[in-house]
């Protein structure tokens, strides 16, 4: 957990959260490379003994306060060895503090090289820094998991900061106007309304910007989840803060071919993030089962259409993450996973009447967000405006192995591996070439190939992508 010292209860919460996962090393290093010529490097709080006490009290296993020579053995003039991505620092603090984030990525890369941690814990208060360091870890392929922790605030909403101790009493009273202005921003014109509120409170505005939380590029009201961030000067103290603006709750779309493990990981991901799980595959399987039960030819759309008129299809979550599927009051949870249903579901799902009926139902269920759906065309046809789109896939051989294991566990006969591979390849062909809503990766979807990945690793990857778009403060992880 990298810090510059001057620890407070915001750092304490980081330490407490991190200590639940394993031993915690807190570093204290006032990095000269991230201060501009006229900034507060010389007066930045240096309270090492108090920092040690707070870190120990909150559960840290060790505190490390390296010297400048230890971090930059070649000396400061040649120390800046990395640059933050230009696109991530053209707005917000990056625009007004040139070189700041280059200094941040340089020191954090050095710390990670020296410590080799499994996890990097950071506060969400400086969201731009969090985004940039997430990119650093990916670009360097360090295999480090980046965890963000929500901003800790005073009772009046002011975000805890080491620099808050600079505030004189009168300034401290005015500083509370920053979180209040962000919290009460006018949805029709949030930037202007915040600027007006801050100016009225006597705060000097450095910037107020609305950006995409992941790209940090300006965005407008058409973006369902955006970041409204501001920096001000209150007296001689610089303060930053942000809020998430959400026109609806988060919406996640997970697509991919048959046997890629979508249902398993999506269900677990939904439970971990507190999202409703929508298994669209189960919906199409349910209609296929109904077609077979009524003796209707699965190729005959005209005969299938009347079955949809009075269809009562319900998906119910069960304790422990399971799901019950009811068709016209009958529990078909196991029946829809049979080889017979599997063999015909692609053909049934290709009928326009079926897709239109189920897509309309799915859109209605996701209108308010707070949902993760998996299927074949979620990110392209059902929820093209999803905040996160993932195309989950695996090789045919890997999917055949998983299918064999699933059939065995459900008590069905298991065909030869070559036969399963042929079935899966044929299913891929049918799904990707059908006229109505074919299986295709959305242009803005992240492809995740899961060969060799454990279920937990796939879920962690999904959580990481979700958190790069939606902060903990905006959508808290459920307790437990």
UniProtKB/Swiss-Prot annotation:
Q: Where does ATP bind?
A: 4-11, 123-126, 152, 160-163
- SUPFAM superfamilies (alphabetical): Nucleotidylyl transferase, P-loop containing nucleoside triphosphate hydrolases
Tell me the keywords, alphabetical order. Answer: ATP-binding, Cytoplasm, Kinase, Ligase, Multifunctional enzyme, Nucleotide-binding, Pantothenate biosynthesis, Transferase
Function description: Catalyzes the condensation of pantoate with beta-alanine in an ATP-dependent reaction via a pantoyl-adenylate intermediate.
Protein name in UniProt: Bifunctional pantoate ligase/cytidylate kinase
Q: Which example biological process does GO assign this protein?
A: pantothenate biosynthetic process
Instruction: Give the originating organism.
Output: Synechococcus sp. (strain CC9605)
What gene is this protein a product of? panC/cmk
Active site per database record: 11 (proton donor)
Where is the stretch described as Cytidylate kinase?
244-480
The protein's location, in the record's own words, is: Cytoplasm
Q: Which family does it belong to?
A: In the N-terminal section; belongs to the pantothenate synthetase family.
Question: Which positions does UniProt annotate for (R)-pantoate binding?
Answer: 34, 129
Keyword Kinase set for record: yes
Which InterPro entries does the record associate with it? Answer: Cytidylate_kin, Cytidylate_kinase_dom, P-loop_NTPase, Pantoate_ligase, Pantoate_ligase/cytidylate_kin, Pantoate_ligase_C, Rossmann-like_a/b/a_fold
């Amino acid at each position: 957990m990298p810090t510059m010292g001057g620890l407070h209860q915001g750092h304490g919460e980081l330490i407490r959260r991190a200590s639940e996962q394993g031993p915690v090393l807190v570093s204290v290093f006032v990095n000269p490379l991230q201060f501009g010529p006229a900034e507060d490097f010389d007066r930045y709080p240096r309270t090492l003994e108090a920092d040690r006490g707070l870190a120990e009290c909150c559960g840290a296993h060790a505190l490390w306060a390296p010297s400048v020579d230890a971090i930059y053995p070649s000396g400061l003039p040649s120390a800046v060895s990395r640059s933050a991505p230009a696109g991530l620092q053209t707005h917000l603090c990056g625009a007004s503090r040139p070189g700041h984030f280059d200094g941040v990525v340089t020191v954090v890369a050095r710390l990670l090289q020296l410590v080799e941690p499994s996890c990097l814990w950071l506060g969400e208060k400086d969201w731009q820094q969090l985004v940039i360091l997430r990119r650093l870890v990916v670009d360097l392929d360090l295999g480090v998991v980046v965890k963000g922790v929500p901003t800790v605030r005073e009772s009046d909403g002011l975000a805890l900061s080491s620099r808050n101790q600079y505030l004189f009493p009168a300034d401290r009273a005015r500083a509370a106007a920053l979180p209040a202005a962000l919290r009460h921003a006018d949805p029709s014109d949030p930037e202007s309304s915040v600027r007006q509120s801050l100016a009225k409170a006597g705060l000097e505005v450095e910037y107020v910007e609305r950006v995409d939380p992941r790209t940090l590029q300006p965005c407008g009201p058409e973006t369902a989840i955006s970041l409204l961030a501001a920096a001000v000067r209150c007296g001689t103290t610089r303060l930053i803060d942000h809020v998430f603006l959400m026109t609806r709750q988060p919406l996640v779309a997970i697509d991919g071919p048959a046997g890629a493990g979508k249902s398993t990981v999506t269900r677990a991901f939904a439970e971990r993030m507190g999202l409703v799980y929508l298994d669209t595959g189960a919906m199409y399987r349910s209609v296929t089962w109904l077609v077979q039960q009524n003796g209707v030819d699965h190729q005959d759309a005209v005969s299938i259409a009347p079955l949809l008129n009075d269809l009562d299809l319900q998906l119910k979550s069960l304790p422990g993450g399971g799901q019950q599927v009811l068709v016209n009051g009958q529990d078909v949870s196991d029946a829809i996973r049979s080889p017979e249903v599997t063999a015909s579901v692609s053909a049934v799902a290709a009928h326009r009447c079926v897709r239109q009926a189920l897509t309309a139902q799915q859109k209605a269920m996701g209108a308010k967000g707070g949902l993760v759906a998996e299927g074949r065309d979620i990110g392209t046809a059902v929820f093209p405006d999803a905040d996160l789109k993932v195309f989950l896939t695996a090789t045919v051989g890997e999917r055949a192995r998983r299918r064999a294991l699933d059939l065995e566990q459900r008590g069905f006969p298991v065909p030869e591996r070559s036969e399963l591979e042929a079935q899966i390849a044929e299913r891929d062909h049918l799904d990707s070439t059908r006229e109505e809503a074919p299986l295709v990766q959305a242009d803005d979807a992240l492809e995740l190939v899961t060969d060799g990945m454990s279920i937990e690793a796939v879920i962690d990857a999904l959580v990481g992508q979700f958190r790069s778009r939606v902060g903990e403060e905006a959508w808290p992880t459920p307790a437990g």
